[in-house]
C-alpha cells in the first residue's frame, strides 16, 4: 500500500506533463497542415484564385482572431461550394481552420470591401506563419 501512495503524485505529474505536450503538439500539427495547404494553394495558377471574396480582414478592430478565422472559413466554403475548383484543398483548409475559429460569425457582404481568393489566402498564410512562430 505504501508504494501506491508514493506513485499517485508521480502519475498525476506525468499525466499533467503529457497533456501539456499533447496540447502544444496539436497546435503545431494543425498550423503546419494549414500552412502547407496555403503554400500549395497560393502557388496554384488557377482562375479561381482571382474570384472575388469579402475582405474578412477588414473587420472591426475589436474582432477576435477566432472571429476572423470563422469569417475566412465562411468565404472558403462559399467558394468551394459554388465553384467547382480547388475543392479538395479549400475544403481541407476550411476543416482545419474551423478548429481555430469561433463557432458563429457573420460576413456582411454589403458593407465589406472585396478582395480576391489569392489575397485572402496570402494574408491567411502570413497570419498562420506568425501564429506558428509563437506556438
From Swiss-Prot:
Belongs to the IL-4/IL-13 family. GO terms for biological process: B cell activation; immune response; interleukin-4-mediated signaling pathway; negative regulation of apoptotic process; negative regulation of inflammatory response; negative regulation of osteoclast differentiation; positive regulation of B cell proliferation; positive regulation of isotype switching to IgE isotypes. GO terms for cellular component: extracellular space. The keyword Signal applies. InterPro entries: 4_helix_cytokine-like_core (IPR009079), IL-4 (IPR002354), IL-4/IL-13 (IPR001325), IL-4/IL-13_CS (IPR018096). This is Interleukin-4. Participates in at least several B-cell activation processes as well as of other cell types. It is a costimulator of DNA-synthesis. It induces the expression of class II MHC molecules on resting B-cells. It enhances both secretion and cell surface expression of IgE and IgG1. It also regulates the expression of the low affinity Fc receptor for IgE (CD23) on both lymphocytes and monocytes. Positively regulates IL31RA expression in macrophages. Stimulates autophagy in dendritic cells by interfering with mTORC1 signaling and through the induction of RUFY4.
Amino acid at each position: 500500500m505504501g508504494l501506491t501512495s508514493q506513485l499517485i503524485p508521480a502519475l498525476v505529474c506525468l499525466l499533467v506533463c503529457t497533456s501539456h505536450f499533447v496540447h502544444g503538439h496539436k497546435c503545431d500539427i494543425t498550423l503546419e497542415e494549414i500552412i502547407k495547404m496555403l503554400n500549395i494553394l497560393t502557388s496554384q495558377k488557377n482562375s479561381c484564385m482571382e474570384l472575388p471574396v469579402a475582405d474578412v480582414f477588414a473587420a472591426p478592430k475589436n474582432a477576435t482572431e477566432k472571429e476572423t478565422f470563422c469569417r475566412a472559413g465562411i468565404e472558403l466554403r462559399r467558394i468551394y461550394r459554388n465553384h467547382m475548383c480547388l475543392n479538395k484543398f479549400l475544403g481541407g483548409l476550411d476543416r482545419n481552420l474551423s478548429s481555430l475559429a469561433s463557432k458563429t460569425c457573420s460576413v456582411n457582404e454589403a458593407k465589406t470591401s472585396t478582395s480576391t481568393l489569392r489575397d485572402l489566402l496570402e494574408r491567411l498564410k502570413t497570419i498562420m506563419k506568425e501564429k506558428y512562430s509563437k506556438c
